[in-house]
Amino acid sequence: MIPVRCFSCGKVISNYWDEYKRRVTDGEDAAAVLDDLGITRYCCRRMFLSHVELIDVLSPYQ
């Protein structure tokens, strides 16, 4: 689960996650996808580049 807002600046970023993930999975360059989506701030870009999906790992321990 991607955070709804950037931790640093507060910009809403979660609405871009599905498009970003789909395009990167299809083989596009992550930097080019972020540029195309209009994610230009370094703080917001790091939210996408450093995100790791842990929900599937943690869900068995509920």
Swiss-Prot record:
Summary of the function given for this chain in its UniProt record: DNA-dependent RNA polymerase (RNAP) catalyzes the transcription of DNA into RNA using the four ribonucleoside triphosphates as substrates.
GO biological process, one term: DNA-templated transcription
GO cellular component: cytoplasm; DNA-directed RNA polymerase complex
Molecular function per GO: DNA binding; DNA-directed RNA polymerase activity; zinc ion binding
Lineage: Archaea, Methanobacteriati, Methanobacteriota, Stenosarchaea group, Methanomicrobia
Protein name (record): DNA-directed RNA polymerase subunit Rpo10
Major location (coarse): cytoplasm
Family per record: Belongs to the archaeal Rpo10/eukaryotic RPB10 RNA polymerase subunit family.
Cofactor stoichiometry and binding remark: Binds 1 zinc ion.
UniProt catalytic activity: RNA(n) + a ribonucleoside 5'-triphosphate = RNA(n+1) + diphosphate
Localization terms from the record: Cytoplasm
NCBIfam families to which the protein is assigned, alphabetical: PRK04016.1
Protein residues bound to Zn(2+): C6, C9, C43, C44
Quaternary structure, from the entry: Part of the RNA polymerase complex.
Keyword line: Cytoplasm, DNA-directed RNA polymerase, Metal-binding, Nucleotidyltransferase, Transcription, Transferase, Zinc
Cofactors (names): Zn(2+)
The enzyme's E.C. designation: 2.7.7.6
Domain of life: Archaea
Species, as recorded: Methanosarcina mazei (strain ATCC BAA-159 / DSM 3647 / Goe1 / Go1 / JCM 11833 / OCM 88) (Methanosarcina frisia)
